[in-house]
C-alpha cells in the first residue's frame, strides 16, 4: 500500500519574527495568529502561550522556540518566535527553524537598536533570503515625519547588510492594539479596525514579497554517505538519507569529498529491502553504484548531481560558542585552535585561522557564549556550500555550532 501523503492545497512557507528585545515580536506573532485564526484551521495563539516557549534541543544545544501556524488566502505559514535574544542567535545559527523570510519588528517609538542591527547581520550571514519590516507601536508616534525617519534609518541599516532596503515592504501598525481588538472580536474582517487592518496589510505584503521556496525534491540531488558495504556479485552500496532532490536508476552522480571527485552511474536503489526506480528527498536509501570498490567510498563523502557541489577546505562561518552550562568549554579559545568540524555525517579536523567581530576588527580569543565570525582551514576537502550547518567538536562533545557564510577556497 502506498504511504499516505500529508495533503495540503496551499504552498507552505516558513517565516519568523526578528528584532530588538521589547519591540513587540511576540505581540506581533500573537496578533497575526489571532487575526488570521478565522481563516486558519488552527486556533489563534495567545501572547503567554508564545512567550513561554518550550525548550527544544538542536544539535545538542537547548533553544526556546515557539512555533505558530496560520493561513492566508494564498498560503500556509509556519512561524517561529524566540523569547530571548540568545535563543535567536542559537536558532538562526543551528538552523533549528529554517526561515524562508523574516519579519523585522522595529519600534517606531525607539527606532533601530543594537539587536535590530545584530539580527539583520545574522539574517544575512545565515542566509535568510527576504525581510519584510513591521514598524510597531505606531500608535505612540503622532508625527508622520518621525515615522518616515525611522523607516529611513531601518532602510539604511538593511542596505548596509546587502538587503535591498529601498525595495523591502514596510508596514506601520500597532501589534498590541490589533491583538486586543482581535481577541475581543474573533471573527473581525478587513475594514473594521485600522490597527487590525495593518496586520492584514502586513500579511498581504508577505504573501507578495516573500517567494514560495523551491521544494526540496526540485533541488539538485544530494545524499551524505552514512555507511558503505558490498553485495557479492552486485557491487558497492552507499546508504544515507537523501537531503534534497530526487534520483533514478541509471542517473550519473558524483562522489565528492575527502579524495578526488569520481563520477559513477546508479545501478540500483533500495529502501526497506525492496528495490525502487526512484527515490526522493527524505528517503533513507541504499544506492548501488557501478565500478566503485567498497574502499572508494566512506562516511563523510556525499553523492550528488554532477557539478552541483564542490569540495573545499577553507571557509568563513558564523559561529555560536556554547557556554559551560550548555556542555561547552569552560575556558576561551584562541586563533590556531584545532577542533573537529562535524559536517553532515563526519568529523574533519581543521584549524581556526582568524576570528572577526561584527565591526570587522580581528578578535584574539573567543569566550563561551560568544557569537563570532571565523575562518577555518580543514585538513581534507569536503563538500561544503554557503548556508550549510556544522558543529565544532572537541573530544566528541559539541563546543560550538556554526553556519557557512562564505566559501574561500
UniProtKB/Swiss-Prot annotation:
Gene3D superfamilies: P-loop containing nucleotide triphosphate hydrolases (3.40.50.300), Translation factors (2.40.30.10). GO terms for molecular function: GTP binding; GTPase activity; translation elongation factor activity. Its EC number is 3.6.5.3. Residues 174-176 are annotated as: G5. Residues 19-26 are annotated as: G1. It is an enzyme of class 3 (hydrolase). Keywords: Chloroplast, Elongation factor, GTP-binding, Hydrolase, Magnesium, Metal-binding, Nucleotide-binding, Plastid, Protein biosynthesis. It is found in: Plastid, Chloroplast. Residues 60-64 are annotated as: G2. Residues 10-214 form the tr-type G domain. The keyword Plastid applies. One of its GO terms (cellular component) is chloroplast. Its main location: plastid. Residues 81-84 are annotated as: G3. PROSITE patterns: G_TR_1, G_TR_2. It catalyses: GTP + H2O = GDP + phosphate + H(+). GTP binds at residues 19-26, 81-85, 136-139. Residues 136-139 are annotated as: G4. Mg(2+) binds at residue 26. GTP hydrolase that promotes the GTP-dependent binding of aminoacyl-tRNA to the A-site of ribosomes during protein biosynthesis. Belongs to the TRAFAC class translation factor GTPase superfamily. Classic translation factor GTPase family. EF-Tu/EF-1A subfamily. This is Elongation factor Tu, chloroplastic. It comes from Rhodomonas salina. The lineage of its organism: Eukaryota, Cryptophyceae, Pyrenomonadales, Pyrenomonadaceae, Rhodomonas. The gene is tufA.
Amino acid at each position: 500500500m502506498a504511504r499516505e501523503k500529508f495533503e495540503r492545497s496551499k504552498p507552505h512557507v516558513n517565516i519568523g519574527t526578528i528584532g530588538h528585545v521589547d519591540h513587540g515580536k511576540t505581540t506581533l506573532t500573537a496578533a497575526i495568529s489571532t487575526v488570521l485564526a478565522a481563516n486558519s484551521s488552527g486556533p489563534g495563539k495567545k501572547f503567554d502561550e508564545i512567550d513561554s516557549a518550550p525548550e527544544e534541543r538542536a544539535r545538542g544545544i537547548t533553544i526556546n522556540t515557539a512555533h505558530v501556524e496560520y493561513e492566508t488566502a494564498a498560503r500556509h505559514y509556519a512561524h517561529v518566535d524566540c523569547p530571548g535574544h540568545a535563543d535567536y542567535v542559537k536558532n538562526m545559527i543551528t538552523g533549528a527553524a529554517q526561515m524562508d523570510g523574516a519579519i523585522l519588528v522595529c519600534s517606531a517609538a525607539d527606532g533601530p537598536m543594537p539587536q535590530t542591527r545584530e539580527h539583520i547581520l545574522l539574517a544575512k550571514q545565515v542566509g535568510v533570503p527576504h525581510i519584510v519590516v513591521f514598524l510597531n507601536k505606531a500608535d505612540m508616534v503622532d508625527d508622520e515625519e518621525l515615522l518616515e525617519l525611522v523607516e529611513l534609518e531601518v532602510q539604511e541599516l538593511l542596505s548596509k547588510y546587502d538587503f535591498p532596503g529601498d525595495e523591502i515592504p514596510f508596514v506601520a501598525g500597532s501589534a498590541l492594539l490589533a491583538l486586543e481588538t482581535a481577541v475581543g472580536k474573533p471573527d473581525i474582517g478587513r475594514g473594521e479596525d485600522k490597527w487590525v487592518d495593518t496586520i492584514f496589510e502586513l500579511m498581504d505584503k508577505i504573501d507578495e514579497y516573500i517567494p514560495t521556496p523551491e521544494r526540496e525534491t526540485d533541488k539538485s540531488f544530494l545524499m551524505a554517505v552514512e555507511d558503505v558495504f558490498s553485495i557479492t556479485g552486485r557491487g558497492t552500496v552507499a546508504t544515507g538519507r537523501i537531503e534534497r532532490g530526487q534520483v533514478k536508476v541509471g542517473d550519473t552522480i558524483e562522489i565528492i569529498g575527502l579524495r578526488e571527485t569520481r563520477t559513477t552511474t546508479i545501478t540500483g536503489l533500495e529502501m526497506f529491502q525492496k528495490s525502487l526506480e526512484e527515490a526522493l528527498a527524505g528517503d533513507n536509501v541504499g544506492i548501488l553504484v557501478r565500478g566503485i570498490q567498497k574502499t572508494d567510498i566512506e562516511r563523510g563523502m556525499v553523492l550528488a548531481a554532477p557539478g552541483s557541489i564542490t569540495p573545499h577546505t577553507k571557509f568563513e562561518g558564523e559561529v555560536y560558542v556554547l557556554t559551560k552550562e550548555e556542555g561547552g568549554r569552560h575556558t576561551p579559545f584562541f586563533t590556531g585552535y584545532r577542533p573537529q568540524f562535524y559536517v553532515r555525517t563526519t568529523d574533519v579536523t581543521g584549524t581556526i585561522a582568524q576570528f572577526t567581530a561584527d565591526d570587522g576588527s580581528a578578535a584574539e580569543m573567543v569566550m563561551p557564549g560568544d557569537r563570532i565570525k571565523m575562518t577555518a582551514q580543514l585538513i581534507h576537502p569536503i563538500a561544503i556550500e554557503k548556508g550549510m550547518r556544522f558543529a565544532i567538536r572537541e573530544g566528541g562533545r559539541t563546543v560550538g555550532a556554526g553556519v557557512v557564510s562564505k566559501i574561500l577556497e
